[in-house]
Amino acid sequence: MDNYKILLDHETIQKRVKELGEEITRDYQCKEPVVICMLKGAVYFFADLTKNIKLPLMIDFARLSSYRSGTTSGQMELIYDITAKIEGRDVILVEDIVDSGKTLKYFIELLNKRNPTSVKVCAFLDKKERREVDIKVDYAGFDIPCGFVIGYGMDYAEKYRELPFLAEVINPPKA
């Protein structure tokens, strides 16, 4: 795909991820939060972020989907659930992008049934303009406008996640 415009280069991304790690480290002093990576998109951000959090962490993974091959299906599906016991624990959900907020809201409601002390959200990208439900992003990497993005974990039909930068696709192909 050659029809894209770079929005964030690798250095800019890494600088912001380091700042987020420092902020989370300050906020969770003397605690050992459970940090949950929302697969697949957040894996690059999650790996870089957790290296910059200078605390003991318990990490886990979940995969919840409402997307199929670049399109939205609108149906929530829990594909892979966490294995950590989170009752009485502080939880940080790490997301690649918060768009409508529906998927995240659904997962937070599932987690809250397990009685964590707190659930906070750390997202690489926040698309506030597209929010359809009331979801607070506690730690946001970057606010971005509407547009289809690839790179640094974001994909189009499972491709382009490995790009070290974030780019907006110009005239994305129709799925």
Residue positions per predicted region:
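PRPP-associated nucleotide enzymes
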Residues: 1-175
